[in-house]
Amino acid sequence: MSDILVVEDEAIIRTALKRLLERHHYQVAEAGSVSEACERHNLDNFDLIISDLRLPGEPGTELIRRAANTPVLIMTSYASLRSAVDSMKLGAVDYIAKPFDHDEMVETVQRIIASGSSARATAQNIR
């Protein structure tokens, strides 16, 4: 079972995303900001971090730097597509527009986690 951290300041969105992912057999932890995520969790223990771009305090892209070994999927509104591209340049593994389509979110998560598992297996075989 894969572990996912959802960082979203809007409780309704955070809860909906958690339920969606749990229905697909993911273990989900939550935080409402970057600082809360860092204080409550070891970011390297997750297979994926899904974060809103605009959060109170620091932007979601700060998690890319703080969780260098964990892929970060950025969620953004349609109005901030330019910010999504900038997030990718900073190292986000992908972005998804809000409001997100449930099937698209699950497919994106599955793809990222499968890709990460393959990369980890390859790295272990090289050692």
What do the predicted segments below correspond to?
Residues 5, 30-48:
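Acidic, metal-coordinating helix/loop segments flanking the phosphotransfer/catalytic sites
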Residues 14, 56, 80:
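The feature encodes the CheY-like receiver
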Residues 33, 59-62:
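Acidic catalytic/metal-coordinating carboxylates
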Residues 80-82, 96, 100-110:
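C-terminal output helix
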